[in-house]
Amino acid sequence: MNYSHDNWSAILAHIGKPEELDTSARNAGALTRRREIRDAATLLRLGLAYGPGGMSSLREVTAWAQLHDVATLSDVALLKRLRNAADWFGILAAQTLAVRAAVTGCTSGKRLRLVDGTAISAPGGGSAEWRLHMGYDPHTCQFTDFELTDSRDAERLDRFAQTADEIRIADRGFGSRPECIRSLAFGEADYIVRVHWRGLRWLTAEGMRFDMMGFLRGLDCGKNGETTVMIGNSGNKKAGAPFPARLIAVSLPPEKALISKTRLLSENRRKGRVVQAETLEAAGHVLLLTSLPEDEYSAEQVADCYRLRWQIELAFKRLKSLLHLDALRAKEPELAKAWIFANLLAAFLIDDIIQPSLDFPPRSAGSEKKN
């Protein structure tokens, strides 16, 4: 990050006017007094220096701030200010996405929204302390939503507000609990979620057990297949009555099926577990559950939509490799939130700044008109 004053003015122009930042910071409780830090823009600048700025400690940030006449305060004072500013940084990041959504809103047809989450661990490794849940638009190649929770908060398809013009796409982590899928089955948005052959309570329309392996074995070799199933509540009556869904089995090509089965055997061998023969057999297929009607979306179209899911995985990798989101420096909860939100704000700003250059193809040397 370039720390020059000219560069900061350009960055600030993408976030908001100084007086607007002052108001939002006061409303969020981030700027209760102006001693040492004169305004909200300065507080934000210090937060970005500590987060995506790459500075290794609060002491380094305060030394840089004094050297460049940004602010004069101790590392302890900065710690208190950044802890109080955590929620405000999150609000600024959310506002950046809200402006983006207003500009790039869907104009026709269904909008695809990929959803996934990633774990963030505190310094020293060990178990993850935070989980970052995010939505991603594969059309604009930009994030659309985010929510930060502790690591105990499970994945949910309904975490973000639903709209009738969207299709949510998620991996098997979202397809292991019927209540997770039910929220969209009776909601506004459609869904495509990958499932495990034993991950849900599969029922027939009559309420009898659905023979998943019989269904897979009945498919023509190398051909896709589909049927309508009922999703049971896994014995939890409070979860509601069974609901219908469209089950699609996508047959993998022989070489990819072999890779899938080899990976499955390797992972279970490493964990000291024995793979069931049925599980190994099912690994030759990708099982998708969807609410999309058959007369509007063929099985192949549903599979094509799901194949776009790699984009959000790649986006998470960019956050971790370029902004080092997985290198959390803070252990104290509020300071950790401030660090994560500052990094997200920087990532969203970078996307917005470079997006105009991606909207038009570069002009080739031979495209100039000759006079």
Swiss-Prot record:
<comment type="similarity">
    <text>Belongs to the transposase 11 family.</text>
</comment>
<keyword id="KW-0815">Transposition</keyword>
<protein>
    <recommendedName>
        <fullName>Transposase for insertion sequence element IS421</fullName>
    </recommendedName>
</protein>
<dbReference type="InterPro" id="IPR012337">
    <property type="entry name" value="RNaseH-like_sf"/>
</dbReference>
<keyword id="KW-0233">DNA recombination</keyword>
<dbReference type="GO" id="GO:0006313">
    <property type="term" value="P:DNA transposition"/>
</dbReference>
<dbReference type="GO" id="GO:0003677">
    <property type="term" value="F:DNA binding"/>
</dbReference>
<dbReference type="GO" id="GO:0004803">
    <property type="term" value="F:transposase activity"/>
</dbReference>
<comment type="function">
    <text>Involved in the transposition of the insertion sequence IS421.</text>
</comment>
<dbReference type="InterPro" id="IPR047952">
    <property type="entry name" value="Transpos_IS4"/>
</dbReference>
<dbReference type="Pfam" id="PF01609">
    <property type="entry name" value="DDE_Tnp_1"/>
</dbReference>
<keyword id="KW-0238">DNA-binding</keyword>
<keyword id="KW-0814">Transposable element</keyword>
<dbReference type="InterPro" id="IPR002559">
    <property type="entry name" value="Transposase_11"/>
</dbReference>
